[in-house]
Amino acid sequence: MPKYRSHTTTHGRNMAGARALWRATGMTDDDFGKPIIAVVNSFTQFVPGHVHLRDLGKLVAEQIVASGGVAKEFNTIAVDDGIAMGHGGMLYSLPSRELIADSVEYMVNAHCADAMVCISNCDKITPGMLMASLRLNIPVIFVSGGPMEAGKTKLSDKIIKLDLIDAMIQGANPNVSDEESAQIERSACPTCGSCSGMFTANSMNCLNEALGLALPGNGSLLATHADRKQLFLDAGKYIVALTKRYYEQDDVSALPRNIANKAAFENAMILDIAMGGSTNTVLHLLAAAQEGEIDFSMTDIDRLSRKVPHLCKVAPSTQKYHMEDVHRAGGVIGILGELDRAGLLNRDVSNVLGLNLTQTLEAYDVMLTQDEGVKQMYAAGPAGIRTTKAFSQDCRYPSLDTDREEGCIRTREHAYSQDGGLAVLYGNIAADGCIVKTAGVDKDSLTFRGPAKVFESQDEAVEAILGGKVVAGDVVVIRYEGPKGGPGMQEMLYPTTYLKSMGLGKSCALLTDGRFSGGTSGLSIGHVSPEAASGGLIGLVQDGDFINIDIPNRGIVLDVSEAELAARRETEEAHGDAAWSPKGRERQVSYALRAYAMLATSADKGAVRDKSKLGG
């Protein structure tokens, strides 16, 4: 029988000092036999996805206490990728994921907590907490802050849905008036919550449902809706039961590595491909798998991407549907239901409720369930009122979207395409693979050949795009922006946004060893591995070299002879210590970022630390 970790600090005369300090936090004699559960919050006023979380940790903590546990809350950092975008702040975004994972480990191990409830929401916070959960392997339940309501505004006598990306595109479009740009900006992000499309934050919160570590509804139920409060209450209640299952019944199925096992990781990736999730999810799933010592790699993702259809199309791939519409159609469980009926899921998986996949679908799939309470939960909709408060409205749709032929979620037979929303490409320029969000690629661009326009940084590329130096047919190559070369693997949202604003969104391709925002669409290929700073072939591309992109056949090739590439490599390596570094780039890199770069792996490994350099 496993021993409660917390007994290390609460039992025995030699722990009198520790107990004295615990008493100073409000604990009493009766508490020293109870499980100590960490409430890992991420409240900050910097991030709209986290601005409403201040009191939600207390909500979870009170429920833990009522259920027989001891709750201890602490906070992690949280970076807003949208606010950090387009300047030096973006260098810190991905490295913050590692800091979040480490800080959770430090706090939980230093104080010997028995279990965790992770209150996350935005881009790097959910992955960082997920990495920590699988690293620590103690009982955990995730509950996120929830999605933002879609923005809405009236243009040309028509109400349209908006999000952050619309504000960015129109703000950079010289043909849009100042008045219209300001109207879109003021309407794009109306409430607290993670940005309203299938961007990185919402993608990851959906994947946590598929992994089994979050409660049904977690990925899609709006941050503003009163129904979301129940998820926080349930998380506080169920974590105590989950903790006792492990420590008092020796039930190892309660541990995250046994819930989020390889079969669950495959299901999560299948979901991601089917819903056209952010390419960043690939990076984060690979990183989490490494933390959990789960054998899940780019090879698995490539295999899955070839058989999974695109069943759910959401902004930024379409303006019609946002997360509130996904929820109305049945949310994550609704998509999983269609995937299961298509015979694509691993069924021998469980979740934090102790339910297997069949039981979960019977209870929560709107196409199967007889539970009116569940149907009411999925009818929870937006109020259209600007607010930063959680649970501030209780509006409901008059009916659910169960149209599986032309609705938000489709059956396999009526899929948006039989090819999924994400693809892994291989070729000489990406020997270890690269990622493209096919859900956002125009059908006419699935194959593309063009001359390279090479840039040593995102900033240089942006200047060229806005300066008219990039023309239709070009392949924009942005290198030395990978985990090591950036450092920090910046998101390339501004280059893709500006290509659209300059009318080049469907006539150019973009290739980078950096990554893309979940808000990116178009022929944008990222995560090129190995990256330039690690000697990847992308570092040898020259202006005018032709690059062939073939998404249907999963290929990407630099059309340059092996002899010429060998000569270029020899020339590059002759630079000695200056080899495989950007030429002429001026960038201030802090020592904190240099420390990250020293240990960072390329994107095909999840950009995690190279443990071999640490003796691991």
UniProtKB/Swiss-Prot annotation:
Pathway info: Amino-acid biosynthesis; L-isoleucine biosynthesis; L-isoleucine from 2-oxobutanoate: step 3/4; Amino-acid biosynthesis; L-valine biosynthesis; L-valine from pyruvate: step 3/4
Residues that, per the record, bind [2Fe-2S] cluster: C122, C195
Catalyzed reactions per annotation: (2R)-2,3-dihydroxy-3-methylbutanoate = 3-methyl-2-oxobutanoate + H2O; (2R,3R)-2,3-dihydroxy-3-methylpentanoate = (S)-3-methyl-2-oxopentanoate + H2O
UniProt-listed Enzyme Commission number(s): 4.2.1.9
UniProt remark on cofactor binding: Binds 1 [2Fe-2S] cluster per subunit. This cluster acts as a Lewis acid cofactor.
GO biological process: isoleucine biosynthetic process; L-valine biosynthetic process
A GO term from the CC aspect: cytosol
Binding site for Mg(2+): D81, D123, K124, E491
Residue numbers annotated as active site: S517 (proton acceptor)
GO terms assigned for molecular function: 2 iron, 2 sulfur cluster binding; dihydroxy-acid dehydratase activity; magnesium ion binding
Catalytic class of the enzyme: lyase
Modification N6-carboxylysine occurs at: K124
Domain of life: Bacteria
Cofactor(s), by name: [2Fe-2S] cluster; Mg(2+)
Swiss-Prot/TrEMBL keywords: 2Fe-2S, Amino-acid biosynthesis, Branched-chain amino acid biosynthesis, Iron, Iron-sulfur, Lyase, Magnesium, Metal-binding
Reported function: Functions in the biosynthesis of branched-chain amino acids. Catalyzes the dehydration of (2R,3R)-2,3-dihydroxy-3-methylpentanoate (2,3-dihydroxy-3-methylvalerate) into 2-oxo-3-methylpentanoate (2-oxo-3-methylvalerate) and of (2R)-2,3-dihydroxy-3-methylbutanoate (2,3-dihydroxyisovalerate) into 2-oxo-3-methylbutanoate (2-oxoisovalerate), the penultimate precursor to L-isoleucine and L-valine, respectively.
Quaternary state and interactors: Homodimer.
HAMAP family in UniProt: IlvD
Family (UniProt): Belongs to the IlvD/Edd family.
Name recorded for this polypeptide: Dihydroxy-acid dehydratase
The organism of origin for this protein: Yersinia pseudotuberculosis serotype I (strain IP32953)
